[in-house]
Amino acid sequence: MVAPTALKKSGTDGQTAPGPTGSRIVGTDNTRSIEDDDDILIDQEDSGAAAAEQAEGAREQQGVVLDAEGKPRFAAAASVAETRVKAESRKVPVPPHRMTPLRNSWTKIYPPLVDHLKLQVRMNLKTKSVELRTHPRHTTDPGALQKGADFIKAFTLGFDLDDSISLLRLDDLYIETFEIKDVKTLHGDHLSRAIGRIAGKDGKTKFAIENATRTRIVLADSKIHILGGFTHIRMAREAVVSLILGSPPGKVYGNLRTVASRLKERY
């Protein structure tokens, strides 16, 4: 007779009822005998070596090779022959009084844009604007669209074609625009006399300022556009401002001679 305090044997199927600390996942044998633990040995050095081998294998697959000092060796970067430029477009409005010069000079305007900057360009007569667009395959300069827009803008402001093309060849040229009223508030005949003082007889004063400061000046009513380098624009602006404020032309010419001598010494 079995003692009432003896442990009951498990069923014939060999399964054990899950205890309070057993796994709650059904269908797997989560019990392990104590003898199995003798076969499981964890060595820190072995695990470190295995991890190092795995890391080295992964680096070799990724193309990373370490030298004797442990520094990575990278393959030389492949030279990129062409830079991809995303497709962009720009519209440059053309004033009505510049449409006729634009049509007459169109055969000389679009070749620098198409051949040099690799842009797509067309004249839209309906909207009275020049449309520029980059091509992802042919355009290589990221700043080509801005250069083309500046070139067309300079021509629409009244600059000659050769002076406008210089914006494409040189990177240190700028255009500055200001009005006479920004310097001094003038109306009526006083404004007309100020414009005449800047231009001079037959444009001699304007040409003298341009030659002395190596700039190009356009007088468009009360607006003044100056094309040139940063320092040259500042010198030309000072001469124009002096004429607007009422300085005698002789004094302005003397200052221009001083400016011209300084530029010769600098360059």
UniProtKB/Swiss-Prot annotation:
Which InterPro entries does the record cross-reference, listed alphabetically? KH-I_PNO1_first (IPR055212), KH_dom (IPR004087), KH_dom_type_1_sf (IPR036612), KH_PNO1_2nd (IPR055211)
| Organism annotation | Eremothecium gossypii (strain ATCC 10895 / CBS 109.51 / FGSC 9923 / NRRL Y-1056) (Yeast)
- Residue ranges, annotated region (Disordered): 1-35, 43-62
* Subunit structure, interactors included: Component of the small ribosomal subunit, ribosomal RNA processing complex (SSU RRP complex).
Q: What is the lineage of its organism?
A: Eukaryota, Fungi, Dikarya, Ascomycota, Saccharomycotina
Per the record, the major location class is cytoplasm
Q: What protein does this entry describe?
A: Pre-rRNA-processing protein PNO1
Biased region (Low complexity) positions are: 48-62
What is a single molecular function from GO for this protein? RNA binding
Q: Name one Pfam family in it.
A: KH_PNO1_2nd
Q: Which family does it belong to?
A: Belongs to the PNO1 family.
Its keywords, alphabetically, are: Cytoplasm, Nucleus, Ribosome biogenesis, RNA-binding
Task: Please report the stretch or stretches of sequence annotated as the KH domain.
Answer: 188-240
